[in-house]
Design a protein with these regions (language model features):
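Phosphate-group recognition and catalysis centered on beta-loop-alpha active-site segments
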Residues: 1-227
Length: 227
């Protein structure tokens, strides 16, 4: 089982900040995940929601703001909102999972991926139009289709587009989905798995899955510490 630090290490530090990403990387996780939106002037920045209310108490939306405006914001606990470029620099050679939240595939995302084409970056999104477009334009990139409600439809989309895998809310996971993914060699990523018993159960019964967790240090200790 592979362990992905969710939004860096969301349970240990403010999500999608440089501080959180560094904790996720230091935990020993196999990959560190963060979310990106593209600004009005084409710069991908880290944020989960469309606006900054949750992070910074600001109701303005990412795509309505310039990067210069966003650089002035601070999270509720005083941290900076990083650009995706800053995030990749901070993570060094740590493998990355970049969740694209935009409504379309922006030039800023393509430019970022091209600049870092030698990095181990996987791209995921719940917006399947973005993924189909990315598959056409950058076919070598490892792509994952996210879904909130429709895993069967998403698996058919994955097979049709010949992309790598699916990210799924763990509550929708079941043995049928596992066997389908195993049969068709579809990577399966589950989020967000935090409880120790759940991590150990999935590792024992469904070892092919990977998990996003807010506590990557905990998951690494549970699964990889000497018995």
């Amino acid at each position: 089982m592979k362990i992905f630090g969710h939004r860096g290490a969301r349970g240990l530090e403010t999500e999608n900040t440089i501080e959180s990403l560094k904790i996720g990387a230091a935990s020993g996780a196999d990959r560190v995940e963060f979310d990106v939106w593209t600004t009005k002037d084409g710069i991908p920045v880290l944020n989960h929601n469309a606006d900054f209310w949750h992070m910074a108490g600001d109701k303005r939306r990412v795509f309505d703001m310039t990067y210069a405006e966003i650089k002035k914001l601070r999270t509720l606990d005083g941290k900076k909102i990083p650009s995706a470029e800053e995030a990749l620099r901070a993570l060094g050679n740590v493998p990355v999972y970049m969740e694209v939240k935009d409504f379309y595939l922006s030039f800023g995302i393509l430019e970022l991926l091209d600049k870092h084409k030698d990095r181990d970056i996987w791209v995921g999104s719940n917006n399947h139009k973005i993924l189909a477009d990315l598959k056409k334009k950058r076919p070598a990139i490892k792509i994952y289709a996210g879904t909130l409600w429709h895993p069967i439809e998403t698996m058919h989309f994955i097979r049709k587009q010949d992309i790598h895998g699916m990210s799924l809310q763990y509550r929708w996971f079941n043995p049928v989905i596992y066997q389908f993914c195993k049969h068709y060699d579809i990577d399966l990523l589950l989020y967000t798995v935090n409880r120790p018993w759940h991590i150990k159960f999935l590792n024992k019964i469904y070892p092919r899955v990977s998990i996003f967790t807010d506590y990557p240090d905990r998951a690494v200790k549970l699964l990889r510490s000497p018995k």
